[in-house]
């Protein structure tokens, strides 16, 4: 319940622009947000493994 209210709160335009923070649009996670992909690291990893994110490959050496 608290997570849903935080997601709704993050979608609203804040009173001051510095109060705005990034949140994953898929799962609502506030931490480990990657601006380049606009999602959290966990969602990015899941989508990259399924091949839904172009240009991302699993590294191996």
UniProtKB/Swiss-Prot annotation:
Gene Ontology cellular-component annotations: cytoplasm; small ribosomal subunit
Origin superkingdom: Bacteria
Binding site for Zn(2+): 24, 27, 40, 43
InterPro entries in alphabetical order: Ribosomal_uS14, Ribosomal_uS14_bact, Ribosomal_uS14_CS, Ribosomal_uS14_sf
Note on cofactor: Binds 1 zinc ion per subunit.
Keywords, in A-Z order: Metal-binding, Ribonucleoprotein, Ribosomal protein, RNA-binding, rRNA-binding, Zinc
Described function: Binds 16S rRNA, required for the assembly of 30S particles and may also be responsible for determining the conformation of the 16S rRNA at the A site.
Biological processes annotated in GO: translation
Coiled coil (UniProt feature): none
Pfam families: Ribosomal_S14 (PF00253)
HAMAP family: Ribosomal_uS14_2_B
Protein name, per record: Small ribosomal subunit protein uS14B
Subunit structure: Part of the 30S ribosomal subunit. Contacts proteins S3 and S10.
Native source species: Myxococcus xanthus (strain DK1622)
Cofactor: Zn(2+)
Entry similarity comment: Belongs to the universal ribosomal protein uS14 family. Zinc-binding uS14 subfamily.
Gene3D superfamilies attached to this UniProt entry: 30s Ribosomal Protein S14, Chain N (4.10.830.10)
Alphabetized GO MF terms: rRNA binding; structural constituent of ribosome; zinc ion binding
